[in-house]
């Protein structure tokens, strides 16, 4: 099953990256350079409710990349990159909308991508429709909650499980995007023409 899934993702051109640090600090995996290189050629990020979290975390990561050693140490903040990102992840979740503006990044940093938040484009944010609810409507084959508590320490054995969960959410978002493509295109045209 896992080998088949990897073949399918490869055929789709899917890219997966991760940054991880072991609790004892001896093991580290750093795809930061690959993430930076990815945004040289990929200028559009599509997500679901991505304006409120994913976009912010990506901007924070890319903005701070210049302060990170190859070993993953954020020398300006004097901590490991994973600890830095985790701290801001919690703040972003607790703060809610507008957290990005508290960081002062927008004015001094050229964001290398455009974010398309499908939830916002379809006005599903107004009805608080979650991606899980969308998956049910789409009759998705696998409705899944986060397999590991969001505050848990991540062991190396957990990485594949978390990445599989992320792929499932990405595929739901992609299916939604394809299902309502005409509506998204219409809204995009209206925005372009009337600035709405």
Task: Please report, for each region that a protein language model flagged, where it lies by residue.
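Gly/Thr-rich phosphate-binding beta-strand-loop-beta motif of the actin/hexokinase/Hsp70
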Residues: 1-13
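Conserved DEDDh/DEDDy metal-dependent 3′-5′ exonuclease domain
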Residues: 17-133
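Acidic, Mg2+-coordinating catalytic module of metal-dependent nucleases/exonucleases
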Residues: 46, 119-196
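Glycine-rich, histidine-containing beta strand-loop boundary motifs that form or position
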Residues: 11, 48-50, 146
């Amino acid at each position: 099953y896992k080998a088949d899934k990897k073949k399918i993702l490869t055929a789709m051109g899917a890219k997966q990256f991760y940054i991880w640090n072991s609790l004892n600090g001896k093991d580290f995996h750093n795809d930061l350079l690959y993430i930076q290189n990815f945004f040289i050629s990929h200028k559009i990020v599509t997500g679901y409710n991505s304006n409120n979290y994913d976009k912010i975390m990506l901007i924070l990561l890319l903005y701070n990349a210049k302060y990170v050693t190859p070993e993953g140490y954020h020398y300006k903040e004097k901590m490991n990159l994973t600890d830095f990102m985790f701290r801001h992840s919690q703040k972003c979740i607790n703060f809610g909308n507008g957290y990005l503006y508290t960081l002062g990044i927008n004015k001094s940093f050229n964001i290398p991508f455009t974010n398309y938040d499908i939830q916002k484009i379809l006005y599903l944010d107004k009805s608080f429709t979650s991606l899980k609810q969308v998956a049910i409507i789409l009759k998705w084959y696998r409705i899944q909650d986060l397999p590991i508590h969001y505050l848990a320490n991540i062991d190396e054995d957990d990485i594949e499980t978390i990445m599989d969960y992320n792929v499932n959410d990405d595929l739901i978002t992609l299916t939604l995007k394809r299902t309502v493509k005409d509506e998204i295109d219409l809204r995009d045209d209206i925005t372009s023409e009337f600035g709405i």
